[in-house]
Design a protein with these regions (language model features):
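Helix-to-loop junction immediately C-terminal to a conserved catalytic motif
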Residues: 71
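ABC-family nucleotide-binding domains
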Residues: 177, 183-184, 188
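Conserved ABC transporter NBD signature motif
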Residues: 79-95
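Q-loop/switch helix immediately C-terminal to the Walker
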Residues: 102-105, 110-127, 132
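A short, flexible loop at the N-terminus of ABC-type nucleotide-binding domains that lies
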Residues: 13-50
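Hydrophobic anchor residue at the start of the ABC signature
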Residues: 163
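Conserved ABC ATPase "signature" region
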Residues: 130-146
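Conserved ABC ATPase signature
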Residues: 149-156
Length: 228
């Protein structure tokens, strides 16, 4: 991969309790990705068990790019991503219901009301939890916003709608980017409780990209991204 004066991300990761390989939900091997103007990942590998994983790094460290690669929204130049023993690139359609990802910066959903978007998710995610959605809707104080189009919501309210759907999806791999942007303190506190609850779900990995740990969240794995 030729990338001029590329700068790549190096990986440091820490696991709580020395978790063993037989609990691995997501395996990434030799991942390489570069934009035309810069390199991002070079022979990047990690194994993540069920639970909560924090991808931590400063702005432009590659956090969002990594989530988009894991979601299949970007295609790596090399490497392999395996979810629950299945290579995602070998069976993208079959695995679509196993991965939840919505880029909070995208405007693709903006014309939909929050309710319409949420109502469409159970058909895609067989492990959808309607009771969890009701709890998240209440916890994030979203009831008054459900019939508004997403473009009419504040940054924080839109993120809360997306996270409510993500957390209720039951997807074995759930990807959440910069979760606290625009959130008020009560919503951040509820998010910590919701993530703590999700952490106990067997066989499910929730990957959160953020620049620091969220207080009160039982992170099982912390992956630090740093430019080299």
């Amino acid at each position: 991969m030729a990338v001029g004066a590329a700068r790549f991300v190096k990986l440091l990761f820490f696991r709580k309790g020395n978790m063993v390989a037989d609990n691995v939900v997501l395996q990434v091997e030799g991942l390489c990705f570069a934009y035309p103007e810069c390199g991002v990942l070079n022979q990047w590998s990690v194994a993540l068990p069920a639970g909560l994983a924090l991808v931590r790094g400063d702005e432009s460290s590659g956090k969002t790019t990594l989530l988009r690669l894991l979601a299949g929204e970007l295609t790596a130049q090399a490497g392999r991503i395996t979810l629950q023993g299945v290579c995602l690139s070998d069976a993208p359609t079959a695995c679509a219901h196993k991965v939840f990802w919505v880029d909070p910066r995208s405007g693709d959903l903006d014309k939909l009301t929050a309710r319409t978007w949420l109502d469409g998710l159970p058909a895609r995610y067989p492990l959808w939890d309607a009771a969890a959605l009701a709890a998240h809707t209440e916890g994030f104080s979203l009831n008054e916003h459900l019939d508004k189009p997403l473009y009419a919501l504040s940054t924080g309210s839109k993120r809360k709608v997306l996270m409510a759907g993500a957390l209720a999806s039951g997807a074995p791999l759930t990807l959440i980017d910069e979760p606290v942007a625009g959130l008020d303190k009560p919503s951040i506190q509820y998010l910590a409780r919701a993530l703590t609850s999700v952490a106990a779900q067997p066989g499910r990995l929730v990957v959160v990209a953020h620049y620091e740990k969220l207080a009160g969240v039982p992170w099982g794995t912390v992956v630090d991204l740093a430019r080299t």
